[in-house]
Amino acid sequence: MHIDWWTLGLQAINVLILIWILSRFLFKPVAAIVEARRASIARLLDEAHATRVAAEAEREKARQEVTSLATARAAALQKAEDEAKAETETILANARSEAGKLREAAKADIARARQDEAAAMADHASQLAVDIAGKLLSRLPEEARISGFIEGLAQGLAALPEAIRTNIGATDAPVQLKAARALTEAETQACRVRLSEALGHPAEIAVDVRPELIAGLEIDMPHAVVRNSFRADLTRITAALIQTGSMQTGQEAPRPETP
């Protein structure tokens, strides 16, 4: 085989020139294009990654906002429920208090009405009893209005403690004796004798005429009260009647005035 070195050399030179030309006008531009495309792809990838990161951040922010809104809504609903419950309790408490006040006021009104009715009945009964007693006594002898009450008054006086009886009439001041009418000399003497016996020492009396007693005698002093009269009996009877009526209605009876 014969090798033509000049031809081979020329071909080698052609190859080198071709390689230079390709490198100059093909490989470098293509490499530049590839590098530019790679850089563009890398940039796009970076932008996509940044966009994805931003999207993830926005989604997390939105999730947090939704959670915050849900928490705030739940808190607002709970607060509204608590306020409504407290307001309801306040309204109910005020209503119960007002109802209690109305009940107490109604009870007080009923009690006052019953007491007024009982007092009116007591006054009517007392006046009726006085009228009846007056009519009955008008048929009796005048001496019966006094003589029949001397012994009972003396017994009541004798029942007082000794210390009190000792002080009654012990000074020069006479014992104040209330009588339904003026006493005769005999009645005055009978009262003086019997009361002195009950007291255990002599005592003078001063008669104070009180027609409202109807019949009977009374001794009314700051430290001792002894009553034996129709008026006192009527007062006790009226009080007993009122007390009985009040017990039936469950109310406290008004106390009648003592004559």
Swiss-Prot record:
Organism expressing this protein natively: Beijerinckia indica subsp. indica (strain ATCC 9039 / DSM 1715 / NCIMB 8712)
Cell wall biogenesis/degradation listed as a keyword: no
UniProtKB keywords: ATP synthesis, Cell inner membrane, Cell membrane, CF(0), Hydrogen ion transport, Ion transport, Membrane, Transmembrane, Transmembrane helix, Transport
Record field: transmembrane: 5-27
Cited function: F(1)F(0) ATP synthase produces ATP from ADP in the presence of a proton or sodium gradient. F-type ATPases consist of two structural domains, F(1) containing the extramembraneous catalytic core and F(0) containing the membrane proton channel, linked together by a central stalk and a peripheral stalk. During catalysis, ATP synthesis in the catalytic domain of F(1) is coupled via a rotary mechanism of the central stalk subunits to proton translocation. Component of the F(0) channel, it forms part of the peripheral stalk, linking F(1) to F(0).
Chief location bin: membrane
Family: Belongs to the ATPase B chain family.
Keyword Cell inner membrane: yes
Domain of life per record: Bacteria
Name this polypeptide is given: ATP synthase subunit b 3
GO cellular-component term (any): plasma membrane
GO molecular function: proton-transporting ATP synthase activity, rotational mechanism; proton-transporting ATPase activity, rotational mechanism
Subunit organization: F-type ATPases have 2 components, F(1) - the catalytic core - and F(0) - the membrane proton channel. F(1) has five subunits: alpha(3), beta(3), gamma(1), delta(1), epsilon(1). F(0) has three main subunits: a(1), b(2) and c(10-14). The alpha and beta chains form an alternating ring which encloses part of the gamma chain. F(1) is attached to F(0) by a central stalk formed by the gamma and epsilon chains, while a peripheral stalk is formed by the delta and b chains.
Gene name for this UniProt entry: atpF3
Recorded topology in the membrane: Single-pass membrane protein
